[in-house]
Amino acid sequence: MKAKSHLSNKKRKRASGFLARMKTKAGRKILARRRAKGRKRIAIK
């Protein structure tokens, strides 16, 4: 059984990259939450 998903990096960045998060109000909320928590990476590289 494979655990990891094999999405292409382009798809991954479009779906959950920093710019994708900044586009929506909900996405900005996610970033703010992750900043508040003190995450080293707030969005995927």
Curated annotation (Swiss-Prot):
Ribonucleoprotein as UniProt keyword: yes
Feature: compositional bias, Basic residues: 1-15, 22-45
Keywords, ordered alphabetically: Ribonucleoprotein, Ribosomal protein
Pfam families tied to this protein: Ribosomal_L34 (PF00468)
Keyword field contains Ribosomal protein: yes
Disulfide bonds: none
Single Gene Ontology BP annotation: translation
Molecular function via GO: structural constituent of ribosome
Top-level division of the source organism's lineage: Bacteria
Spans annotated as Disordered: 1-45
UniProt-listed InterPro entries: Ribosomal_bL34 (IPR000271)
Any one annotated GO CC term: ribonucleoprotein complex
Family to which the UniProt record says this protein belongs: Belongs to the bacterial ribosomal protein bL34 family.
Protein name per its UniProtKB record: Large ribosomal subunit protein bL34
Organism listed in the record: Sulfurihydrogenibium sp. (strain YO3AOP1)
Lineage: Bacteria, Pseudomonadati, Aquificota, Aquificia, Aquificales
Gene: rpmH
